[in-house]
């Protein structure tokens, strides 16, 4: 797809650190035996084998060359409960990617939730470990913390949170929470995720927060946060909208060209 290559080139030219290409893994349900509950309701359950996934990465690398600088492995297991049995399959997959493309090839996995201690030991670079709305991010369930202690033991650059439904009222709290937790990668959007169990569920959301980029007022916050000057930006923005104050004598005329909204203070003497 020529457009994929072009968009990746534009992103890199604009300052993006890496361009990674999307490949599904569908929880590696293809590795499960017939009749296993983990295969239930997974579309094309036998399609996404290790061989197929590796083939998709090779196609991306062949077609896009140096622009393909990593892979985004979507729909990865979190390693908890029955999913623990698929950790060896993910280890095999990730180890083969690493052996084929080297340490500079960025491997990103998307579990969408916190991951088990055994999953943390795999050789990925970044894990998208949160993918919910701002309400869930700001009011986390302490029984299932966003970043458990075993994850906090790793560098912040290993963790990536995606927060939907961000508003003008809560975005500061979202950034503050990410800083407090030690999450180095953050994608915020005012887009909403809506799933209808009767119309495809998680596999075909009726409301997709990634269908369009975030609104401009949200986009304008991300780079300042990444570079550490968001508080300064917000202070400057506030000064820009603060009304001007003009001190005049009791009978002094307002100067021509005084901006609308200027506060006029009259001196008694």
Locate each region found by the language model.
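Glycan-processing catalytic domains of CAZymes
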Residues: 1-233
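Extracellular/surface-exposed low-complexity repeats and stalk/linker segments enriched in Gly/Pro
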Residues: 236-269
């Amino acid at each position: 797809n020529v457009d994929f290559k072009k968009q990746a080139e534009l992103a890199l030219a604009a300052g993006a650190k890496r361009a990674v290409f999307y490949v599904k893994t569908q929880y590696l349900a293809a590795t499960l035996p017939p009749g296993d509950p983990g295969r239930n309701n997974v579309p094309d359950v036998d399609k996404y084998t290790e061989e197929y996934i590796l083939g998709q990465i090779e196609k991306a690398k062949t077609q896009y060359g140096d622009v393909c600088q990593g892979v985004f492995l979507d729909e990865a297991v979190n390693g908890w409960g029955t999913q623990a049995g698929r950790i060896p399959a993910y280890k095999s997959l990730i180890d083969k990617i690493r052996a084929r493309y080297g340490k500079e090839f960025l491997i990103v996995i998307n579990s969408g939730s916190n991951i088990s201690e055994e999953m943390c030991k795999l050789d990925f670079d970044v894990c998208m470990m949160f993918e919910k709305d701002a309400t869930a991010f700001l009011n986390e369930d302490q029984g299932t913390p966003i970043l458990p202690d075993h994850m906090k033991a790793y560098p912040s650059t290993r963790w990536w949170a995606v927060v939907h439904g961000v508003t003008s009222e809560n975005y500061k709290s979202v950034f503050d929470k990410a800083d407090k937790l030690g999450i180095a990668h953050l994608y915020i959007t005012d887009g909403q995720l809506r799933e209808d169990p009767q119309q495809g569920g998680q596999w075909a959301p009726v409301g997709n927060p990634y269908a369009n980029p975030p609104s401009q007022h949200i986009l304008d916050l991300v780079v300042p946060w990444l570079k550490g000057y968001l508080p300064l930006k917000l202070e400057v923005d506030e000064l820009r909208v603060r009304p001007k104050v003009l001190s005049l004598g009791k009978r002094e005329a307002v100067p021509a060209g005084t901006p609308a909204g200027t506060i006029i203070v009259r001196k008694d003497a």
